[in-house]
């Protein structure tokens, strides 16, 4: 694919008087994993709907697989696989039948569809569940089946909306391994997620959006360096405000969330020396991570 598989240019979308996507621009390169991050209500779901032609932008331009959207969205979707946030597998069919039935939407012959099933089941590690009904599968198995179904048409682009929500750690890591194998095969992936570790592990670049606007973009490690650029000490105690008054001189920046004081430090030694041996206090010294970036950009307060 010579052109950008996904391209947004100054896109806007309103619902009534509310501007939910506000001049959003980003472009995804061939073969990269690009993450959309943002708090609830930031406009991520609306962005995906517009990308797939399920909602029309009020301004700006969108292209998917080189096709203008929404005018050629149906044609573009023939080259796209989608993993929705919530599984929409058919509970009346077996694992094998879910794949076979879905292949009909792409006009495949029965012979071609049957030839696809075995390698897709192997990819999803569901070979032993081919004849099981969906209701017999664990949550992780259902997500892997949904991913396998998204690959029926051998898509150039995969769009994944929070693909590991609700999975236990083992199932999540297996899903990550499967996604990395797709990237190694040259697939292009657009992913939304609330798991910062997931974004940091999988994504080549990230776009952080808030209130429909892009507020940061870059590689995970670059964002961590530019937005934080130091270590973090988390201090747990009964009076974080008093602790901040006492310790802020030893930190580059401080934040409070609940009973936790976050101290961003260039040199941790002076601060940790004041904490050692103090009853009722616990602390953790760690490198900065993507969650620190996200919370610095969007705030630590809960957003609905």
From Swiss-Prot:
Group of enzyme by EC: translocase
Residues that bind ATP: 38-45
SMART domains: AAA
GO CC field: plasma membrane
Protein EC: 7.6.2.-
GO molecular function: ATP binding; ATP hydrolysis activity; transmembrane transporter activity
InterPro entries the UniProt entry points to: AAA+_ATPase, ABC_transporter-like_ATP-bd, ABC_transporter-like_CS, ABC_transporter_ATP-binding, ABC_transptNodI, P-loop_NTPase
Keyword annotations of the record: ATP-binding, Cell inner membrane, Cell membrane, Membrane, Nodulation, Nucleotide-binding, Translocase, Transport
Keyword Transport among record annotations: yes
Bilayer topology term: Peripheral membrane protein
Primary location recorded for the protein, binned into one broad class: membrane
Annotated localization: Cell inner membrane
Family recorded in the similarity comment: Belongs to the ABC transporter superfamily. Lipooligosaccharide exporter (TC 3.A.1.102) family.
Its biological purpose: Part of the ABC transporter complex NodIJ involved in the export of the nodulation factors (Nod factors), the bacterial signal molecules that induce symbiosis and subsequent nodulation induction. Nod factors are LCO (lipo-chitin oligosaccharide), a modified beta-1,4-linked N-acetylglucosamine oligosaccharide. This subunit is responsible for energy coupling to the transport system.
Protein name: Nod factor export ATP-binding protein I
């Amino acid at each position: 694919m010579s052109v950008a598989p996904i391209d947004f240019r100054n896109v806007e979308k309103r619902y009534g008087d509310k501007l939910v996507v506000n001049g959003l621009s980003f472009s995804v390169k061939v073969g990269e994993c690009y993450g959309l991050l943002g708090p609830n209500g930031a406009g991520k779901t609306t962005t995906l709907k517009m990308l797939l032609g399920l909602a029309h932008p009020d301004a700006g331009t969108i292209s998917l697989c080189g096709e203008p959207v929404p005018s050629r969205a149906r044609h573009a979707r023939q080259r796209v696989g989608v993993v929705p946030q919530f599984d929409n597998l058919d509970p009346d069919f077996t694992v094998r039948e879910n794949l076979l039935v879905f292949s009909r939407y792409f006009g495949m012959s029965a012979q071609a569809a049957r030839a696809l099933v075995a390698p897709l089941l192997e990819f999803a590690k569901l070979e032993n569940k081919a004849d099981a009904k969906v209701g017999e599968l664990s949550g992780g198995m259902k997500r892997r089946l949904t991913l396998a179904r998204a690959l029926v048409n051998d898509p150039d682009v995969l769009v994944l909306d929070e693909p590991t929500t609700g999975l236990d750690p083992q199932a999540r890591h297996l899903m990550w391994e499967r996604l990395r194998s797709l990237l190694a095969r040259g697939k292009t992936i657009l992913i939304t997620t609330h798991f910062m570790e997931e974004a940091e592990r999988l994504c080549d670049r990230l776009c952080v959006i808030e209130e429909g606007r892009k507020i940061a973009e870059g590689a995970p490690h670059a964002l961590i360096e530019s937005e934080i650029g130091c270590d973090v000490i988390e201090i747990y105690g009964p009076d974080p405000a008093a602790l901040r008054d006492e310790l802020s001189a030893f930190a580059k920046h401080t934040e409070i969330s609940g009973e936790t004081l976050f101290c961003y430090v260039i040199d941790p030694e002076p601060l940790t020396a004041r904490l050692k041996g103090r009853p009722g206090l616990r602390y953790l010294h760690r490198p900065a991570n993507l969650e620190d970036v996200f919370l610095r950009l969007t705030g630590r307060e809960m957003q609905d």
